[in-house]
């Protein structure tokens, strides 16, 4: 039967991508349906119980700046918070939170169930309804049809999922969940490039069988960082300690002696695994000169004894896993609660997508998350949010939107995927962003919340908080610029004691704040009242100290903006562009970049090649530029 109600947007899958996608579309006013094979697993953390980290927390805070759920759920479920790279510059600082799986999932579930315009239904999807290269709806396992002209697919590792433990394997989406076989077959019928990737997870340990006296303790930071602009320390649950142990030569010997029983090294697994989160057998093989590897022992929650040993992901047979675990200090008598495993799954070449994450071949069909070749909750959530936004915009007959590389890490993520593609699971790092000094985690709201409000993503409460913070920053910057300290004054003596230099002339408080020896607290209270808000005060200090660098980076962006705004006709015949090598012609024809800037980022495309294309466009009268706030041009809704 056909379900009697029609929807604007249907989202398939209730993981980190799916939840952000359906929430975004619903916040924008679209009648949205979330379909999941099991609503008890909505927002489940399938792998490690943590959110954030280097590069990843930037994505979390950008999701939050656009009204998403991940950061606030982390504050409600986070049982240890730390700032990574705290001694380095603000561009690479990152917040990481250990999360209670149950509390995090409950926070996501509560958000979903209380979101207006959002309906939830428990059924796996087996088929898509496609008419004349346009998606029209989906068919569930029970034959029930739901109709919508926008469908967001966020199937994670479930498409053709195959779980490996040793040389044995069986079908599964993750441990305890069935795979999506029928949907995988259906998608393979579409003119999309598909391949296989793999990821893995470590065995889980019973804390009652671990000798913690032998482990190094790792406490969180105090004062605790807060992940969401809507969050606070009062909502964070009780905090716990994590621990550190190490592999040793005995561990490595066990692994080396059993590599022939590894599905990775025996050729059973075809998919490529994540480079930056390798299995323990991969570490031993690739870094043969190292006699030890760090293992972080992460509690799974406040009400469970289950431990997650971060650093020993493995698909070796269970008897080998037991030897590996018990070879480590403190784990001599450890009991494994769940075995580690690897999972192989389908992913689709992201170069077959537009920057809106809509497929190029099927109108209204959007992909987000691991099926686009990424790894990580944060990468999935960011894509889900953007896919949900663009599905809603399409339903409303509006042009698609995607932030550019100088606006957000989300823009870097999507642009890398669509322009360069990926052969291995893609993980975000700060090093991937050429404008990272502008794309700090501390200013995500200042970069994106105004756009989020324009799109209909931001509620009144978050908007008010944002406006107050922005006003506080502006007023305080003006106060610091207009407040002066005279040489020889009592205030000058306070400053001289800290910088060991005599002030020979008058300085504004802003000038003093730019000095590396002084922080905001040192100068703000010399005259007048300092800001009470930590986030606003931090912003004032960072913008003062890095003003010169920030201005230079902005100049670089302005110079490149001409390329960013120069459109390439969708049907341009690169074979007609004189001077281009055959290799360059093939790459440009395959990628179909929408702007010269995106063409320039394709591997192997030289500045000379870009100049030839630019000259060709000028000669043929094809030179066109984006006129407004450089949105990404996409196929109009239809």
From Swiss-Prot:
GO terms for molecular function: flavin adenine dinucleotide binding. Its cofactor is FAD. FAD binds at residues 13-18, 125, 180, 370. Its main location: cytoplasm. One of its GO terms (biological process) is tRNA methylation. Pfam families: GIDA, GIDA_C_1st, SAM_GIDA_C. It is found in: Cytoplasm. Keywords: Cytoplasm, FAD, Flavoprotein, NAD, tRNA processing. PROSITE patterns: GIDA_1, GIDA_2. NAD(+) binds at residues 273-287. The keyword Flavoprotein applies. InterPro entries: FAD/NAD-bd_sf, GIDA_C_N, MnmG, MnmG-rel, MnmG-rel_CS, MnmG_C, MnmG_C_subdom, MnmG_C_subdom_sf. Signal peptide: none annotated. GO terms for cellular component: cytosol. The keyword Magnesium does not apply. Belongs to the MnmG family. Homodimer. Heterotetramer of two MnmE and two MnmG subunits. NAD-binding protein involved in the addition of a carboxymethylaminomethyl (cmnm) group at the wobble position (U34) of certain tRNAs, forming tRNA-cmnm(5)s(2)U34. NCBIfam families: mnmG_gidA. This is tRNA uridine 5-carboxymethylaminomethyl modification enzyme MnmG. The gene is mnmG.
